[in-house]
């Protein structure tokens, strides 16, 4: 069991974590026709918007109530009212997801009461879902905001089943964690459909942030799960929660609708995917398709090939708790040592990470301990690239944001195929780094000062130079 330690510094230097409001807004982006709204100052929203645009390279729907100094003191009712009216009139969304920020949380705005007043004053908003989630950015992290938003969606949007309501055993709810990419969700959807199951993802980022060009412009999200489909999730046969962060949302779903659930804390690795495949075979009543048996064999072969390069490595990882747990488990299976583990917030899984200590800290902590313990592989998001350069170690980018590489939304790490790809990517990074920095080459052989650096035979002194026609 890992020892979890809290930071003792008076401030955060080079932050690792992203804030709760951004995580909450990210969850609402997986709903069709949605408009996430941050109840706070313009700066809060513009900073988050910049991160999303740089990560996905897409147009991102995100609005603000634009709280000023005066509004912050007197209360944000008028700002929230005006923002909702403007959005409903101009963007015509199917749902508005409202996330609080540190400014409005500190002031103590009762947003739930505000929404009741707004609905009573404007009958045209009666049928427009307004979902509010409390996400103060002075505590918690990105994963906490996502977790709260999804649980709140289940509470507000999912209908209770009728007394004689029938369940569809082939219909499955999937509650993915924030550490999964749109590419991961596409992979999971194909996998579930191969078992004859019909999945409903909440949220479904694969439909809205997968990088496709829509037929026509819309200022809201261009895809995702529809509000009507969310309402019918109570008629599913099972709920699959991916990541420990989704335990709460799955419990809310079961309490409200009676749908049983199972949590899969990891889907990157051989044994976690074996368990996942067996579960899908059990609930569908179908054998595991031969294509996945072949993919399993390919993953086993990839692990054999790559363990020469990954096994024994000292790894430093900085990530959200579920992503840290997922990657560290896979690397441990490959024989690597997770020597430094830094995360952003508390979670029940971090105590079970196979390392001596997990620090809730920042990138300065990650770099400092990686240097102290002589780590030779660094894994975190793009803000860790300078640390990797100073440490002169291979750098594998994961999490959010990844803004200095393309295709962040299409990375796949789930399933046999996704795990195989991650293993190859990390092993190739290690090989390339060794070739560039450690392997001797002819231009490094002559390192003694004074020796000629040119290649070729030496002419005798005084001999005339002959030209070659």
UniProtKB/Swiss-Prot annotation:
- State the PROSITE patterns in the record: NITROGENASE_1_1 (PS00699)
Under InterPro entries, the record lists: ChlB/BchB/BchZ, Nase/OxRdtase_comp1, Nase_comp1_CS, Nase_Mo-Fe_CF
Q: Binding residues for [7Fe-Mo-9S-C-homocitryl] cluster, per the UniProt record?
A: 44
GO biological process entries: nitrogen fixation; protein-containing complex assembly
What does the record give as its pathway? Cofactor biosynthesis; Fe-Mo cofactor biosynthesis
Q: Taxonomy-wise, where does this protein's organism fall, top ranks first? A: Bacteria, Pseudomonadati, Pseudomonadota, Alphaproteobacteria, Hyphomicrobiales
Record key words, sorted: Metal-binding, Nitrogen fixation
**Region annotation Disordered: where it falls in the sequence:** 435-469
Q: Does the keyword Lyase apply?
A: no
- Check the record and name the NCBIfam families matching this protein: nifN
Q: Gene behind this chain? A: nifN
The UniProt function text for this chain reads:
This protein may play a role in the biosynthesis of the prosthetic group of nitrogenase (FeMo cofactor).
Does the entry feature the keyword NADP, yes or no?
Answer: no
Q: Which organism is it from?
A: Bradyrhizobium diazoefficiens (strain JCM 10833 / BCRC 13528 / IAM 13628 / NBRC 14792 / USDA 110)
Record-stated family: Belongs to the NifD/NifK/NifE/NifN family.
Listed Pfam families: Oxidored_nitro
Superkingdom is: Bacteria
A molecular-function term among this protein's GO annotations: nitrogenase activity
Basic and acidic residues bias locations: 435-446
- The protein in question is named Nitrogenase iron-molybdenum cofactor biosynthesis protein NifN
The record, for SUPFAM superfamilies, names: Helical backbone' metal receptor
């Amino acid at each position: 069991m890992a020892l979890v330690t809290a930071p003792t510094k008076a401030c955060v230097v080079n932050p690792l974590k992203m804030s709760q409001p951004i995580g909450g807004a990210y969850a609402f982006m997986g709903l069709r026709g949605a408009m996430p709204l941050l109840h706070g100052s313009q700066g809060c929203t513009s900073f988050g918007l910049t991160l999303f645009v740089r990560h996905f390279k897409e147009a991102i729907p995100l609005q603000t109530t634009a709280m000023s100094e005066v509004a912050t003191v007197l209360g944000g009712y008028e700002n929230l009212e005006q923002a909702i009216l403007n959005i409903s009139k101009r963007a015509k969304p199917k749902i508005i997801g409202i996330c609080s920020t540190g400014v409005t949380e500190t002031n103590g705005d009762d947003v739930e009461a505000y929404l009741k007043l707004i609905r009573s004053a404007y009958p045209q908003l009666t049928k427009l879902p307004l979902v509010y989630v409390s996400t103060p950015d002075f505590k918690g992290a990105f994963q906490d905001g996502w977790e709260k938003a999804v649980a709140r969606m289940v509470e507000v949007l999912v209908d209770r089943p009728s007394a004689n309501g029938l369940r569809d055993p082939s219909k499955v709810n999937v509650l993915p964690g924030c550490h999964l990419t749109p590419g991961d969700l596409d992979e999971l959807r194909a996998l579930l459909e191969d078992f004859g199951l019909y999945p409903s993802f909440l949220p479904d980022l694969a439909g809205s942030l997968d990088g496709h060009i829509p037929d026509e412009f819309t200022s809201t999200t261009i895809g995702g799960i529809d509000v009507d489909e969310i309402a019918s999730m109570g008629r599913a046969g099972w709920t699959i929660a991916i990541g420990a962060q989704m335990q709460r949302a799955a419990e809310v779903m079961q309490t409200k609708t009676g749908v049983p659930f199972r949590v899969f804390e990891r889907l990157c690795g051989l044994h976690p995917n074996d368990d996942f495949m067996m579960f899908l075979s059990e609930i569908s009543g179908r054998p595991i398709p031969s294509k996945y048996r072949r993919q399993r064999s390919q993953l086993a072969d990839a692990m054999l090939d790559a363990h020469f390069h990954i096994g024994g490595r000292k790894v430093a990882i900085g990530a959200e708790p579920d992503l840290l747990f997922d990657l560290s488990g896979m690397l441990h299976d490959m024989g690597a040592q997770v020597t430094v583990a830094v995360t952003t917030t508390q979670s029940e899984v971090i105590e079970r990470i196979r390392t001596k200590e997990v620090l809730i800290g920042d990138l300065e902590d990650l770099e400092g301990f990686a240097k102290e313990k002589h780590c030779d592989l660094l894994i975190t998001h793009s803000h860790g690239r300078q640390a990797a350069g100073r440490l002169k170690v291979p750098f594998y980018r994961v999490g959010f944001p990844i803004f200095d590489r393309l295709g962040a939304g299409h990375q796949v790490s789930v399933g046999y195929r996704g795990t195989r790809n991650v293993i190859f990517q990390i092993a190739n990074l290690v090989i390339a780094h060794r070739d560039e920095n450690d392997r001797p080459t002819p231009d490094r052989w002559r390192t003694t000062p004074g020796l000629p650096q040119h290649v070729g035979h030496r002419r005798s002194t005084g001999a005339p130079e002959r030209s070659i026609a």
